[in-house]
Amino acid sequence: MEVEVKAKQAKAAARRMAVLDENTKNLALNHMADALIKDMGKILEANKKDVVEAEKRNIKASLIDRLKLDEKRVEAMAKGLREISALPDPVGSIEKMWKRPNGLQIGKMRVPIGVIGIIYESRPNVTADAAGLCLKSGNAVILRGGSDAINSNIAISSILAKAAYETGIPEGAIQLIENTDREEVNRMMKLNGLIDLIIPRGGASLIKNVIENSTVPVIETGVGNCHIFVDETAKFNIAKDIIVNAKVQRPGVCNAVETVLVHKSIAKEFLPLMVEELTSLGVEIRGCQITKEICPQVKEATDKDWETEYLDLILAVKVVDGIEEALDHISKYSTGHSESIITENYENAMMFLKSVDSAAVYVNASTRFTDGGEFGFGAEIGISTQKMHARGPMGLEELTTYKYVILGSGQIRK
């Protein structure tokens, strides 16, 4: 089976990856970036095949946007690899060191996780991001992208692997599962002992399937039912601009806003301004009963809308009595990704920051900033919505673990 053969190769490569020096890794990353630019034509040609097939199957426009590559996006992938090369290498760093009364020196050293499996859907840029981050953090990576992007992923991964191996990276460190049969994914999720960690990136159904069926440890990522609460002291122009950015800039990504909650005391003034702006930009508004009374042109929301990650130009809107009801709503429906409050009230801002149990919580800013690059981590492997090991944008450090190193001078336990 393809995945088992490649997992064994990755396991062998991981031992050598763990001891690679930083200069070799940085040289490889920059060579990989050069190769993406040099072979951009091959990448775009392969991507065109994927896009044509997606259009034939009437895939949603927002999902085709995630799939589509152009010169600018390939250049951004290359830039991301260069940025990763410029980041400090976490591997081998000692976080703490202390001395025991018997003279033993004990420290916590950052080390690679080993072999990381990435299961993702239709965003071919993930192929480059994942390969780069895993390489810099000393891990071998097995990539399994969605069938929608198979031609793009084969082109990108083969270009990256060739460039990496030319600069001293062990063969088997960057591999793509080319078989699009779902059984390969099921086998991949059972390869304990060969794969150390699986990170799924994609929609709710993909992540749910991996969590429920993988015997390999999983970090849950990505599903983003994100909220913005417009408090009664919010400045309307700021609130409107933030909501438009969070919904319209890239509606098909996990940090786009899906539900806006509006304080009842400003609803009659603010909602018409917001609805007019959003509808002019092609957004479909689904509102609660009060929203519909104020703006009759909107569609009526159902309970299903409050729990839906649309990944499209659709926005649910609800009028709430105040911050307590907003917090209750977010607690009930949030996926723990990103939430924002628009307010000039310091106490409410602090209450929101402390009360909302999500990976990223904002005051007066768009949820679209939940991103490794925007946080200064360089590219990210995903946004973790769980609490164990990693939370929020997962950069280099989150792709490592630690071990204790103990330095002695002949001590024995008595």
Curated annotation (Swiss-Prot):
It comes from the Bacteria. Keywords: Amino-acid biosynthesis, Cytoplasm, NADP, Oxidoreductase, Proline biosynthesis. Pfam families: Aldedh. One of its GO terms (cellular component) is cytoplasm. Its EC number is 1.2.1.41. It is found in: Cytoplasm. It is an enzyme of class 1 (oxidoreductase). One of its GO terms (biological process) is L-proline biosynthetic process. The keyword Amino-acid biosynthesis applies. The keyword Cytoplasm applies. InterPro entries: Ald_DH/histidinol_DH (IPR016161), Ald_DH_C (IPR016163), Ald_DH_N (IPR016162), Aldehyde_DH_dom (IPR015590), G-glutamylP_reductase_CS (IPR020593), Glu-5-SA_DH (IPR012134), GPR_dom (IPR000965). It catalyses: L-glutamate 5-semialdehyde + phosphate + NADP(+) = L-glutamyl 5-phosphate + NADPH + H(+). Gene3D superfamilies: Aldehyde Dehydrogenase, Chain A, domain 1, Aldehyde Dehydrogenase, Chain A, domain 2. GO terms for molecular function: glutamate-5-semialdehyde dehydrogenase activity; NADP binding. Transmembrane segments: none annotated. Pathway: Amino-acid biosynthesis; L-proline biosynthesis; L-glutamate 5-semialdehyde from L-glutamate: step 2/2. Belongs to the gamma-glutamyl phosphate reductase family. Catalyzes the NADPH-dependent reduction of L-glutamate 5-phosphate into L-glutamate 5-semialdehyde and phosphate. The product spontaneously undergoes cyclization to form 1-pyrroline-5-carboxylate. This is Gamma-glutamyl phosphate reductase. It comes from Thermoanaerobacter sp. (strain X514).
